[in-house]
Design a protein with these regions (language model features):
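Aromatic-rich carbohydrate-binding modules that target alpha-glucans
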Residues: 78-124, 137-163
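Single conserved hydrophobic/aromatic residue that forms the stacking wall/gate
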Residues: 167, 172-177
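Basic K/R-rich, polyanion-interacting modules in nucleoproteins and related proteins
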Residues: 37-86
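Long, internal scaffold/assembly segments composed of regular secondary structure
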Residues: 1-43
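Short beta-strand elements
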Residues: 30-31, 36-44, 150-165
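Active-site-adjacent segment of 2-oxoglutarate/Fe(II) JmjC oxygenases
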Residues: 2-19, 147, 154-169
Length: 177
C-alpha cells in the first residue's frame, strides 16, 4: 500500500570524555566540541536488520550532569553518508532533530573529494534517531527507498485521524508490533 521504510539509525553523545554510540571521534575546536559520527552507508541493497529505535525521536541526556535540560552542552555533529551522488534529487537528514521538516537546515551537501554527503549540525548532548531521505527534483516528499530501503518487517508508528467536514473527530497513534 505504501513504502515501509527502515528502522531509524541511532547515535548518542553524552560526554566529551568518551565516544558514544556511533561516534568516531570527539574533539574541541573553539567554541564547540565537535562530534564526528562513524560514516554511514546506504542500506537499500541489504537485508532487513532489526534495531530498537525510537521512531525518529531524540532525548537530551548527559552523563556528567544532574539536569540535562539546563546543563547539557551543545556540540557540532558531523554526519557523513558515503555513496555516489544521487542524480535528479537531494539528500536530507530526517527525524525530530529537524522537526521532520525537509529544508535547507536538513539538506546535505555532496563532497566530490571525499565522495560522500556531509552535514554539520549544532545539537545538544543526547541520544538521537535519524534517517536519510531522498527528495526527487520538483518534489517535496522524502523517500526512504533509495538510501534506507523499504522492508515490510520495519516497526513503524502510525497516526490515524478521523476527520469530518468541520473538525477532527478522533486521533489515535498505533504502533506496528
Amino acid at each position: 500500500i505504501f513504502p515501509a521504510g527502515n528502522e531509524y539509525r541511532r547515535m548518542e553523545f553524552l560526554s566529551n570524555k568518551y565516544n558514544g554510540m556511533h561516534v568516531e571521534n570527539i574533539s574541541f575546536h573553539n567554541p564547540y566540541y565537535n562530534v564526528e559520527l562513524m560514516t554511514d552507508y546506504r542500506r537499500d541493497k541489504g537485508t532487513y536488520q532489526y534495531d530498537q529505535d525510537q521512531d525518529g525521536r531524540f532525548f537530551i541526556r548527559c552523563s556528567d550532569c544532574n539536569d540535562p535540560d539546563t546543563e547539557a552542552d551543545y556540540y557540532i555533529v558531523h554526519f557523513t553518508l558515503a555513496c555516489d551522488p544521487l542524480p535528479d534529487g537531494s539528500v536530507y537528514l530526517n527525524g525530530e532533530l529537524f522537526n521532520n521538516v525537509l529544508d535547507e537546515k536538513s539538506k546535505m551537501g555532496y563532497n566530490f573529494e571525499t565522495k560522500q554527503y556531509e552535514k554539520a549540525v549544532l545539537l545538544k548532548q543526547g541520544s538521537y534517531n535519524y534517517q536519510y531521505l531522498f527528495v526527487p527534483t520538483g518534489s517535496s516528499v522524502g523517500q526512504t527507498g533509495p538510501i534506507e530501503g523499504n522492508y515490510y518487517q520495519t516497526q513503524n508508528e502510525y497516526s490515524i485521524y478521523a476527520v469530518s467536514y468541520t473538525h477532527l473527530r478522533a486521533h489515535e497513534t498505533v504502533l506496528d508490533l
